[in-house]
Amino acid sequence: MKVAVFTPMPPERSGIADYSALLLPALRARSEVAVVKRGAKKPPRGTDLCVFHVGNNPEAHGWIVEALRRTPGLVVLHDFVLHHLVAGLTIGRRDGHGYLDAMEREGGVVGRLLGHAVLDKRIPPLWENRPEDFHLAGEVLGLATGLIVHSHHVHDRARAARYGGPIWIVPHPAFPVPAVPSVEVAGEPLFGTFGNVNASKRVPQLLEAFARVRRGHPGSGLLLVGAASPGFDLDRRLQRLGLDDAGLVREGFVDEQRLWALMRACDVHLNLRSPTMGETSGTAIRALALGKPLVVSDVGWFSELPGDVALKVPVDDDEVATLVAALTLLATRPDVRAAMGAAALDLARREHDLDRVADLYVSAFEQSAGGAAVSDDVLRDVSRAAAEVGIEPGSVEASDIATRLGEVGLGG
């Protein structure tokens, strides 16, 4: 079986590029897999199955959606909410009507009116402040002959959006831990959070909670790694909380080796976010592989993590107080940190093992390609039978047969 994979790849700065680079060698050991050149719209000749990795970044995935439009296939849906992707493919290309159509397909007349308000700059962009209310995944779901997802959360949202095709839940593979020594970072214990620094990563709530924790545990430290999003005034927030020179260490974007070294230095990893786009966190998977305890927002995939590896913080009016309680527990109980870390490492080895994930992928490939083969066989049999009774292509009878086949998901 020949599989063509449409995906971003390194050196693109994309979590999905890193994901594919990790997974592809294991897939190639099990199947004939070719990565399609970036920007290509068609698979190589002789391809049995096309696999499209789709995420919410228009720069990384716009060309992949264009290829999917030409050749529907198996979609690996890394994010369920695709509003930013659709906005980039429409508004970003001066196709306002395309954006309005997408909003109307999902939200009816109200959706279209909101789309007009966005285009007229009467309200802020919905992909920035209300993306979860309008996921705009409809087109991709309509083109997908099957879905691979990483969580029950995305599975359930796809079904709620009336996707009727096959769905395979395949865990995110664990990254192999490189032999990178830890670096010295002040803080005992040291809490760490990795990724873009912005409001959706609950950084304001985290900073307020840490400021409270540090009053009772002045030796504790917080490591923030990642670029601050435009418009997010981190320095002002730090000064207001008295954290500018007290217990907080900042690093911007770091390369992979530095990332691992900093992650290894942390005693506890925080992975907070709301709203969720339906993503699975690559940094959380790395933390599991390192055997580190997690504190996460109780949303999406993060809610599915076992309670013995992650303390879950509901996104509600008590979020800061709950964060304070979680951080205080982990600051004062090294035995709890050790037990959670051991459970995290066991989970990574058991559920997120790379070979296990690759086997699940290949099984999905075979089932997906097999389904297409069955469809082709049925169509050939119908065509042969029609010819035998004198039904000509293009006739009324042939059109009626094509309509009936389309109703059961066969034919073009």
List the model feature ranges, each with a label.
Residues 125-166, 174-176:
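A short, active-site helix/loop in glycosyltransferases that binds the activated sugar's phosphate group
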Residues 141, 253-254, 261-266:
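Short alpha-helical donor nucleotide-sugar binding micro-motif in glycosyltransferases
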Residues 145, 263-278, 292-293:
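Acidic donor-binding loop of glycosyltransferase active sites
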Residues 148, 184-201, 207-210:
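Conserved donor-binding/catalytic core segment of Leloir-type glycosyltransferases
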Residues 221-235:
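Glycosyltransferase donor-sugar binding loop
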Residues 234-257:
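Nucleotide-activated donor-binding/catalytic signature segment of Leloir-type glycosyltransferases, i.e.
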Residues 345-346, 350, 354-412:
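C-terminal amphipathic helix plus adjacent low-complexity
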